[in-house]
Amino acid sequence: MAQTPEGKVKEKVKKILKRRGVWFFMPRGTTFGTAGVPDFICCHEGRLLAIETKAGGGQPTKLQLNALRSILNHAGCALVVRETNVDAVEQALDFIECNSNTALCWRGFDEEADRQPDTR
């Protein structure tokens, strides 16, 4: 079965997380799940890291951006990863390792660039 472009990004992220020894899981979107939950929920050095993956021109939905924002507001780290910035995962993990005893958080998404256009 051919992998989707977003699936390829997820595979790259998964390889990095496994190589770095990061605990993570990938919530499955179901009818009974919570909409907007990031693709990867990770814990590294006691810090929450949420990763939303996108491919091509895909943009996070408003619910996804709200979830990422909420994680940041609770001292977690959050980022949107695309084919062009998979290295942001490594950078976020490095940041966590260097700042694991501080209240700093990693913001790996641009609210303006990643905003879902309002189509109402």
Descriptions of predicted regions:
Residues 1-120:
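Catalytic phosphate/metal-binding cores of nucleic-acid and nucleotide-processing enzymes, i.e., regions
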